[in-house]
UniProtKB/Swiss-Prot annotation:
GO CC field: cytosol; nucleolus; nucleus
Record PANTHER family: C2H2-TYPE DOMAIN-CONTAINING PROTEIN (PTHR46179:SF13), ZINC FINGER PROTEIN (PTHR46179)
Name this protein carries in UniProt: Transcription factor IIIA
Gene that encodes the chain: TFIIIA
GO molecular function: 5S rDNA binding; 5S rRNA binding; DNA-binding transcription factor activity; RNA binding; zinc ion binding
Expression sites by tissue: Expressed in seedlings, flowers, siliques and seeds.
Species this protein is from: Arabidopsis thaliana
InterPro entries reported in the protein's UniProt record: Zinc_finger_trans_reg (IPR051061), Znf_C2H2_sf (IPR036236), Znf_C2H2_type (IPR013087)
PROSITE patterns to which the protein is assigned, alphabetical: ZINC_FINGER_C2H2_1, ZINC_FINGER_C2H2_2
Length: 412
């Protein structure tokens, strides 16, 4: 018995305790951290391949499970996708329970935001001489940041007192953002070429008249300045170059070029995808079909909303359109500034500002002589017939802005 006990002790002492194996080469170690250290030092390529495979699987799962089938929007969580799908539904299940209010919404958070309007405008602007009131507290901070961020600097420069009224402080929670960032003089002195003083053409931050750093578009002939780099990146996508064109719209009469397939698909969905109305048979874009169907629903149509200002007979179908009318016409709020340096013209609507920038108002060439546009003006009613322009006149023509005088021309 004693001899058998000695044999068992010897065999137990020689027992292999290396229980942790490497999954790549099969080597064994006695401790788990030794195997981990071995894998990190000898199997780096295998680990990188596994990480790439896992990332691809995660991307496939997220794209397949959390992508909207209607518009192609992607979400990280299925709850966000479910909430987004409610915006595509025509059913408005969340109805306002306040008397004499027929407002209804597709999402509950939109209803909660609407209920704040019934409680009145409880939040006022903390600045003096500003009577703006808001129903949501978050709009107060947005209003102060937009209209009162440079009050102290403006008072020092212009000498305005506390009792003076600032005409630009008449707005409320306007969520539209202008591409120029609200700076009247952007990139002044660079000739509108979008290049910095060094002449390298990089989009570096520039100092505007309000003291805020802005990034300038480096495209030749553009020179627009933006407050955030993300706005500049979105603007630079509009400058489609021939070497970066990958897709174009093949619809008749369109033939627009795009840098990638995603931009082309979004363009087709918004501009060329039409749906016929089942009620009246009219043809509408897919993005406008929901608004058209609400016109057939008598219960949801609120009727015409009249402007309460005396002497104004304007009527609107939506309260949001009435608010835009009040800001532009009666309050004379013009938040959108022309992006060309030295212009300073302000507009109440963004599309009017864009039309002004795209027109030939700022396109001119400094010539050796002063020439008017009398021969190019349209024929007035009851006036003389317009003269026929010769080829020599077209070659010698210089298009000049109305404010351009002879003295400034001689200095060019």
């Amino acid at each position: 018995m004693a001899e058998e006990a000695k044999v068992d002790v010897k065999t137990s002492a020689k027992k292999d305790i290396r229980n942790y194996l490497c999954q790549y080469c099969g080597i064994s170690r006695s401790k788990n951290y030794l195997i981990t250290k071995h894998i990190q030092s000898h199997h780096q390529m295998e680990l990188e391949e596994e990480r790439d495979d896992e990332a691809c699987e995660v991307d496939e799962e997220s794209s397949s499970n959390h992508t909207c089938q209607e518009c192609g929007a992607e979400f990280k969580k299925p709850a966000h996708l479910k909430q987004h799908m409610q915006s595509h539904s025509l059913e408005r299940s969340f109805t306002c329970y306040v008397d004499d209010c027929a407002a209804s919404y597709r999402r509950k958070d939109h209803l909660n935001r609407h209920l704040l309007t019934h409680k009145g405008k409880l939040f006022k602007c903390p600045k003096e001489n500003c009577k703006s009131e808001f129903s949501v507290q978050g709009n107060v901070g947005r209003h102060v940041k937009k209209y009162h961020s440079n009050d102290n600097r403006d008072k020092d420069n212009t000498g305005l007192g506390d009792g003076d009224k600032d005409n630009t402080c008449k707005g409320d929670d306007d969520k539209e953002k202008s591409g120029s960032g609200g700076c009247e003089k952007e990139n002044e002195g660079n000739g509108g070429s979008g290049k910095d003083n060094n002449g390298n053409g990089d989009s570096q931050p520039a100092e505007c008249s309000t003291g805020q750093k802005q990034v300038v578009c480096k495209e030749i002939g553009c020179g627009k300045a933006f407050k955030y780099p993300s706005q500049l990146q979105k603007h630079q996508d509009s400058h489609v170059k021939l070497d970066s064109v990958e897709a174009f719209c093949s619809e008749p009469g369109c033939m627009k070029y795009f840098t990638n397939e995603e931009c082309l698909k979004s363009h087709i969905r918004s501009c060329h995808q039409h749906i016929n109305c089942e009620i009246c048979g009219s043809k509408h874009l897919k993005k406008n079909i929901k608004r058209h169907l609400r016109t057939h629903d008598e219960d949801s149509s609120p009727g015409e909303i009249k402007c309460e200002v005396e002497g104004c007979s304007s009527t609107f179908s939506k309260a949001s359109n009435l608010q835009k009318h009040m800001k532009a016409v009666h309050d004379d709020i013009r938040p959108f500034v022309c992006g060309f340096p030295g212009c300073g013209m302000r507009f109440a609507y963004k599309h009017v500002r864009n039309k002004h920038e795209n027109s030939g108002y700022h396109v001119y060439t400094c010539g050796d002589f002063v020439e008017t546009d009398e021969d190019f003006t349209s024929r007035p009613r009851g006036g003389l017939k317009r003269k026929q322009v010769t080829a020599e006149m077209l070659v010698r023509k210089r298009v000049m802005p109305p404010r351009f005088d002879a003295e400034e021309h001689e200095t060019c």
